[in-house]
């Protein structure tokens, strides 16, 4: 059956991926399914369809999209084409999410594009342990998926840092951090993590799991 998708949030990129999630409420489980028949034949990505999202949902889905982009950029399967998608998505989402939370037309439009580009990237290379941990958190505690991602992401970035080469310099630069070319490895890695924390804080995401479980 052909699928025509009309996304109403800017985060999951379900309209351009072959992944979907089934929640088993009785067993408190979330199951990630992959099916090539799940991908839509046409996606109508219209930011006006997302304008009714409340601030909290906008923030959560936006941080989900940023997590897609960052995890996709540093995953083992990353390569030149996926890197192009993910870096551009990081750049767009980082500058647009604050405005989208305030429901500005420009922020909504850019978030619609940024999350879509992130989906184009990660659907080709996969994600990482942030999503692996966020799914059971959501299943067990009913934590919004994007909120769980946003809280876990900085810690996982710190853990993964030794295996990422100079990619955190690229992430920091894409997120608007100045002077990254003159930073040491430790400095630009910290700058990338701090930029993620700052964005999450600015859009009202809790800083710690203790606040949500």
Predicted features and spans:
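Proline/glycine-rich low-complexity loops and linkers
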Residues: 1-19
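Acidic, glycine-rich active-site loops and adjacent beta-strand->loop/helix elements
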Residues: 8-11, 49, 154-157
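Glycine-rich phosphate/pyrophosphate-binding beta-alpha loops
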Residues: 11, 116-149
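Carboxylate- and glycine-rich phosphate/diphosphate-binding segment that chelates Mg2+/Mn2+
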Residues: 16-125
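Short helix-capping/linker segments at secondary-structure and domain boundaries
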Residues: 73-79, 125-127, 159-166, 207
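Gly/Pro-rich interdomain helix-loop hinge
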Residues: 140-213
């Amino acid at each position: 059956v052909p699928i025509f998708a009309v996304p109403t949030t800017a985060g999951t990129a379900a309209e351009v991926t072959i992944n979907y999630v089934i929640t088993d409420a009785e067993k408190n489980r979330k199951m990630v399914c992959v099916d090539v028949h799940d991908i839509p034949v046409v996606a109508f990505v219209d930011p006006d369809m997302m304008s009714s999202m409340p601030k909290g949902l906008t923030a959560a889905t936006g941080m989900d999209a940023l997590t897609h982009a960052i995890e996709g950029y540093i995953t083992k399967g990353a390569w030149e084409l996926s890197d192009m998608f993910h870096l551009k998505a990081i750049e767009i989402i980082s500058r647009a999410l604050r405005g989208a939370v305030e429901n500005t037309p420009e922020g909504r439009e850019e978030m619609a594009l940024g999350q879509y580009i992130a989906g184009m990237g990660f659907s080709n290379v996969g994600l990482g342990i942030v999503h692996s941990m966020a799914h059971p958190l959501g299943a067990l505690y009913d934590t919004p998926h994007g909120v769980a991602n946003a809280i876990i992401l900085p810690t996982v970035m710190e853990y993964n840092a030794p295996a990422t080469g100079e990619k955190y310099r690229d992430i920091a630069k894409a997120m608007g951090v100045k002077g990254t070319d003159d930073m040491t490895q430790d400095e630009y890695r910290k700058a990338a993590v701090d930029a993620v924390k700052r964005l999450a804080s600015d859009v009202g995401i809790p800083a710690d799991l203790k606040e949500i479980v």
